[in-house]
Amino acid sequence: MLWARGRQPDHRIRMSQQTTIRKLAELVNTPVDKLLVQLAEAGMKFSGPDQVVTSTEKMKLLGFLRRTHGKADTPAEAASEAAKKITLNRRKLQEVTVNAGRTKTTVNVEVRQKRTYVKSDNEGSGRAAPMTPDEERADILAKLAASRQRNLDEQQRLAESDRARDEAIQRKRDEEQAAKDRVEAERKAAEEAAAAASAPAPVAAAPAPSSAPAARAPSSPSSAPRPARPAGASPASRPATPARPDDRNNAAKHKTRGSHVMVAGVEDDDATKRFAGQLHLSAADRARRSNVRGKPTGRPGSSSSRRNDGGRGSNQSNSGPHGFERPTAPVVREVAIGETITVADLAQKLALKGGDVVKALFKMGVMATITQSIDHDTAALVTEELGHKAVRADNADFEDALLAHAEDAQGETTSRPPVVTIMGHVDHGKTSLLDYIRRTKIASGEAGGITQHIGAYHVETGRGVISFLDTPGHAAFTSMRARGAKITDIVVLVVAADDGVMPQTKEAVAHAKAAGVPLIVAVNKIDKAGADPLRVKNELLAENVVAEDFGGDTQFIEVSAKVGTGVDTLLDAISLQAEVLELKAVADGRASGTVIESSLDKGRGPVATVLVQQGALKRGDYLVCGIQYGRVRALFDETGHQPASAGPSIPVQVLGLSGVPEAGDDFVVVDDERLAKDVAQQRETKRRESRLVASATNRMEDILAQMGKGEGQQVLNLVIKADVQGSVEALKQSLVALSNDDIRINVIHSGVGGITESDANSAAASKATIIGFNVRADASARKIVESNGIDLRYFSIIYDVIDQVKQVASGLLGVEIREEIIGIAQVRDVFRSSKFGAVAGCMIIEGVVKRSKPIRVLRDSVVVFEGELESLRRFKENVDEVRNGTECGIGVKAYNDVKAGDQIECFERIEVARTL
């Protein structure tokens, strides 16, 4: 550009003399080549820098450059540029209500809007010849006039629209006010008619106590008696008699002194109301102020809610019927109570003070503060105790609607694979049987050769797909077996032919019967020597499990998990039972099911093993699982593959939840993450409230228990971390069950995953022992454990955990002092000694009597003295002990009342270690 090097584009060029191109370039400080290019772009061709540039050519070049930079070359062009821009300004007044403390304040706000419209210059680009300046100016003026006319029309249209809207609003308000006035007039007419019908004869006014009030009485129209209005008279037919300020003052004075008696009748309030409004306000402002002033601030029947329309400070009386009547009977309220409620909320619903409810709870034996939550039963009892009625609150919220919608899954029902749970006693071959069916080696990889969590698999056989759940057989995993029986279709009870029915076998039968699930008995280890299938059938008869060949309906299949004998027959029995059950489910739509197991993987986060029962679970679905929620990031089957979806009766692992869910929780797929989060938070709130109520109850029971037992009970604190949720649950139940009157096992924290720094700090603060079941501590946790001397123990078999905790608890119990009788001597005669006093001549009839051991003197089998054996002699010789059948002399220290026929019992105190 010509003016690019720091110069303004409007520098003037001297045009009084002819100038060459080179000189012009020096003058404007621009290279010659660039100036030649700009001259060529302006339509002027020069052959060299020494040619002369005329003033006309300079002006032409200047105009070209100004147009290039967006500036008008001439005043006409400037006017044309200005004509292309139109600016509209608009002002609008409105009112905004803001909160100022307890009151609301109205603020006037002015909104200013400014818009600029620029007309494009595309229309003139296609014309062949440019217009003359006059024609261009006339055209621009015409367009400007048309634009102004359009703007005026638009403004007029907007003004008319605003006016019509305001008129409609005002008309609606007038109609509402007229309706209110009409209803008020009818109500007052009815009240006046009722008052006139029930009023006694008019009472004459009492004589004035002084002459001054008597002189003013005739001039005051309000003090003169007024005739009663007919019953059918309307308030609108009365004459308008505005009340003067002195009338109101006189009325106030008479009311204060009590010197006049009110005359039967109704005060004429309409005349005062007619002049109560402020005439200088608009209808909208008057309505707004009347709403603010007339808003009731107290209870119904209070003075603030009965304020009339006479304005501030009005002293007009109202002799109509009173708005509040004192109840003649106690008010019985119907109180809706949920699962939990705080004492303060209950007191508010009962319209009582919180202290009254707390007193009632104390009388019932419940100690609670005003902020403490109580359960529904306690709240219902105290409500009935206070004379009110308690009803259960309707908890029909969006969660119930969601679950109901999930149960009514859309789509056609199709046949689904059966879910088979394998149950039985420990080491009876459950996992080995499943290994043979799946052609895998799971049992060899289990710690200790026993299953310690639920395994979920689906197997494709020649008879169709079958889903298997392998449950632990150890006594500690009762809840796991109950959970497996709850979600299953068929229970396969594995019983070892050489071992027979064991305790967990009986428990599995009880779980199957409680769940109403058909039972198939697999008599395993049939290939071993000493196998007796008939014994198994006879023992199960005691549990009401009758075989088909005994006339019952339970199938007994003899199998061998080692060599595979009878496995095909077992699969045929499962398929036959599934056909009889006619298992069906919805294959499409929202998925729902149950969590079988859950764990925390360091690399993948929370992992939940779920069994789909309805619908199809796909990657990307939003699901709610107990108090956890999330989006399904990945699905894995038992082989580690990632299926696209999982249908009914298929177990899969789900990744993407917000936390580790509880085993046994139900899951359901929802539409979006927000709904899932709301449902999970509501469940968490309910669970927290229930936990607070339970903890408060347990805390009170602990206080009472400590008061009764004193401080003799020892407490062993534990922190339990395991690999899966089911193991945590089993460990807690088994270890807490070890508590007795002397020691209490207290699990202060438990969870899934590795031992973290937080777990170590909790153990250090409570002096607890950390138990890691198939998990390890990280570096930071190990550092805290070493610095604080925390007892950290790792386990992989649940037997070892229980045994070790028993040993630790036994160490806390200390030792027990026991007394063991070692010998009994019969007193035959008593001798006197100057040194020892009375000496008993005795015969040892049982055991051995030793010197310096404690003794008891028994007379007629009653202890009369307890002391120490001071002297033991035989043939005048001191001996250390005398055995059975030998005579001896015994000197009892500090006791001289020994008689013939007494028995001397010798015993010793020994320390015995206490165990659980």
Swiss-Prot record:
Ranges of biased composition (kind: Low complexity): 192-243, 293-305
CDD domains, sorted: IF2_eIF5B, IF2_mtIF2_II, mtIF2_IVc
Binding site for GTP: 424-431, 470-474, 524-527
Chain positions covered by the region annotation G1: 424-431
Region of interest: G5: 560-562
Region (Disordered): 151-262, 280-328
Keywords: Cytoplasm, GTP-binding, Initiation factor, Nucleotide-binding, Protein biosynthesis
Region feature G4, mapped onto this chain: 524-527
Residue ranges of the region described as G2: 449-453
Disulphide bridges, residue numbers: none
Pfam families: EF-G_D2, GTP_EFTU, GTP_EFTU_D2, IF-2, IF2_assoc, IF2_N
TM stretches of this protein: none
Region named G3: 470-473
Signal peptide limits: none
InterPro entries hit by this protein: DNA-bd_dom_put_sf, EF-G-like_DII, EFTu-like_2, IF2_assoc_dom_bac, IF2_II, IF2_N, P-loop_NTPase, Small_GTP-bd
GO molecular function: GTP binding; GTPase activity; guanosine tetraphosphate binding; translation initiation factor activity
Residue ranges with Basic and acidic residues bias: 151-191
Residues annotated as domain tr-type G: 415-584
Function: One of the essential components for the initiation of protein synthesis. Protects formylmethionyl-tRNA from spontaneous hydrolysis and promotes its binding to the 30S ribosomal subunits. Also involved in the hydrolysis of GTP during the formation of the 70S ribosomal complex.
Name of the protein: Translation initiation factor IF-2
